Every structure is written in C-alpha cells, then in structure tokens.
Amino acid sequence: MVGRLLDSMTLGRKARRLVTLITLLVLAACTSREVIVEGSFPTPLVDPVPVSVGVLFTQEFKEHELVDDATGRGEVSWRVSTGTAQVEFWSTLFPAFFQNVVFIESYEDLQTYDVDAVLIPKVADVQYAIPLYTNVKVYEIWMRYNLSLVEPEQIIDEENASISLENMQPFAEWPLTAYGKTPTAFMQSDIDAVNLAAVMALRDAGANFITSFLRVPGVMDWIKNPEEAQ
C-alpha cells in the first residue's frame, strides 16, 4: 500500500514537471523579439549627378518598423525597427550620389534653400522569412520602396506655412526593391541574424538605386533641364 502511494506521488511529481516543461516550451515559442536595425554603411564611390536635390524623410519613414504578431501561430513574434537605419543609410548615399543635397525638415527649409527637386522615399513593404531549422540562423528580408521626385512648389502649403504631400504630382515616380540574407549560418543569436539581413537589404537597395536611377522615366529629361521639370 505504502509502495503504491509512493509510486503515485512520484508519478504526480513527474507529471507536474512535464506540464511545467511543456508550459515553458509554449511560452518560449510565443515570445516576442525586437530588433533595432543598425550597421555600417560605407559612402559609395560614384560620379555625382549634377543636380541639387532636397531630400524629405517623412515621420513615417523615420519611424518605420515591421511588426509580425505570430502569437496566434504559436511562433516567435517580431518587431523590426528599420527607421533609424533607413535615415542613416540614405543620408550617406544621397550626398554621394547627387552634386548637392539638402535635407528638408520644415517649410522654412523649402523657402530658404534653392533645390531643383525634392526626393521623397517611402518604405512600401518589408517582409521576412525565418529559417526552416531553428539551429540555422539564416534570415531573409525583402524591402520595397516607392520613390518620388517632385518640384518644391508642389509640396508647399502657403496658406498653412507647412509641407503637404496630399496633392503632389511627381514628375518621376518609381518602385525600388531590395533583398538581404544573413550571410552566415553561425550567428550567435536570431536578433543578430535578422539585423544583418536587414543591413544587407539596405545595401542592396542602395546598389539598385545607383544603377537604376538614370533609367527612370523623366529623370534624364529633368537632369538636362532641371528648370523645366513637369
């Protein structure tokens, strides 16, 4: 009788341990991870395009983040903040690519600085793919941008002394895609792997911008006659 009681108690303890272990595994699977993308972005060596460009980073662009709530799927949820890295990267590339660049922060900047056009980048979409095997930390990230070139007057709201993008009519508008992949399967953490994939995607975006810009419809005509952009 005593032996049966002890066996029952032992089984009970094992069952409780098993339940605890399963609970911990479920909680681990449903945790969330946050990445604030940061990396090194070398200045590209290119012959500058002979125009003066204002660059406008919207608040949405500066604060861009990818949020994937995977709790319903029993997977890890991700929040990947790319905004700061986006601004840092493009703030390095644009001044190297154009002869003169002014970063537009306000209505007063548009009134003060004489630029041929204003370039407005927008992150249209970011997607990611997780590894098939948990011990292989290779992530993939896709980015898609919409870029617009517009005459400065198009975004000036004189009545409210502000910048308005509501009714702008760009004379050049085009999509830009980028892809990044963690270059090694031996990263120390998933967070590091996602960060590096995002950095690679940003660098790819820059390379694609440099090689495709002069082929965008309307751009060459504008470069030849910046005063006559339509």
Give the ranges of each region predicted by the language model.
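Short acidic, glycine/proline-rich loop/turn micro-motifs
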Residues: L66-T71, P131-Y133, A185-S189
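Surface-exposed patches in mature extracellular/periplasmic domains of secreted proteins
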Residues: V102-D109, V219-I223
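Sec-exported extracytoplasmic/periplasmic mature domains
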Residues: F94-F103, G206-G218
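Sec-dependent bacterial lipoprotein signal peptides
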Residues: M1-C30
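Short secondary-structure boundary motifs at beta->alpha junctions and helix caps
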Residues: G74-T82, P152-S212
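A structural "domain/chain start" motif
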Residues: C30-T92, T211-Q230
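Surface-exposed short loop/turn segments
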Residues: T31-I36, S106-E173
